[in-house]
Amino acid sequence: TKKYPASMYDRMVTEMGADANAYTTDDYTAYHMSFTKDDLEKVVEIESDRFQNLSYEEAAFQTEAGAVYGEYRKNISSPWMMLNEKMQATAFTAHTYKHTTMGFEADIKAMPTMYEYSKSFFTRYYRPENVVLLVAGDFDPAALMTMIRKYYGPWTRGYVTPVIPVEPPQKGERSATVSYTGKTLPILAISWKGERFD
C-alpha cells in the first residue's frame, strides 16, 4: 500500500517474528499470520490497510504473473495435478469449478497483460461483505473489537455478487483420458458429485 509499501510490510512482519502466508481453494483465499499478542494492534492495522488500499505497480504484477505461470508448469509435471485438472474440466460443463484454482493455462499465460483486470478483481471481491476475520489466542476480546472497528470500520461496502453459472444435472457417466509424457504407473480416478455445501 502507499502507507506500507511491500518492502516495509515485509520488514515489519520479519521484525515481529511473525509467520505470514496465504492459500487459495476453489471457494476462498485465506491469509494467515502467527505473531505475539504484543503485535496484535499493528497486525490488525497493517492487514486492514492491505485489504482496503492494496497498491502495486504493473511491472511487479507482471513479475508475479510470470511466477504464477512457472508454478502452473511445475504443477502439471505431476500426473496427479494433470488428472485433477482433467477431472474438474470433465465433471463440470458450466460452473466455475470447471477450472482448477490456478485456472486454464491460456488464461495464466495471458495474465501479464491483465494488470487492469487484476485491479478491478481486487476492487470487486475484496469488500467487507466477503471477509471473515478470525483471531485465536491470548488477547482481550473487547480491546480487539475496538481495534477492528477502528481499522476496518471505514471500509466501504459495495460487493456485487457475480452470476455463477448453474451446473446442469449430470445425466450419465463422463470419462476422459489424460495423456502424460512422463513416467508413471497407470492412475484411475473416480469421482461423484455431492450435495451443495452452504
Give, region by region, the residue ranges found by the protein language model.
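His/Glu-based metal-binding/catalytic segments typifying zinc-dependent metallopeptidases
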Residues: R73, V160-D198
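M16/insulysin-pitrilysin zinc metalloprotease superfamily fold
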Residues: K3, S34-A65
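Buried hydrophobic packing residues in well-ordered domains
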Residues: T1, V13, Y31, E47, ...
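M16/MPP (pitrilysin/insulinase) zinc-metallopeptidase core fold and M16-derived inactive scaffolds
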Residues: T1-M33, H99-G103
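Histidine-acidic residue clusters that define the catalytic metal-binding segment
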Residues: T90-V131, V163-E167, R196-D198
